[in-house]
């Protein structure tokens, strides 16, 4: 069994199940102290220019979801996220406890934020609202810059779905 802290698309249980083939036994709101959410992981192209990452910032807080999953499911998340992220062990807090959990962080010196796709931003917002993250945190996510290109954005949404799903399926043990 593993604890995994999701702060981007992995806040969404629906996304974890349908795309990554990960079925958490329990999920709860949690937060990480002294980190901030940034869109500074460079995406593959101008249609998906940036993805969520977290970086150290004293006094800040990242809200997300703490998932209880199997070790195999953690491997699926790692494999389907791609090689840019590193697995980090962190302490996350819920209303009544703290947990040692794994999360993925892309080590970078890139401080400026990149735009993200409208598709990805909507995924983050839907997950944050559905899971009951704070209104202030949702407002911070809403401030992120997003891009949308008719046809190309829809095509890439389908491509990304199958790319992530195929990487998660390759993990069997």
PLM feature segments, named:
Residues 1-173:
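A glycine-rich, hydrophobic/aromatic-adjacent loop/helix-cap motif
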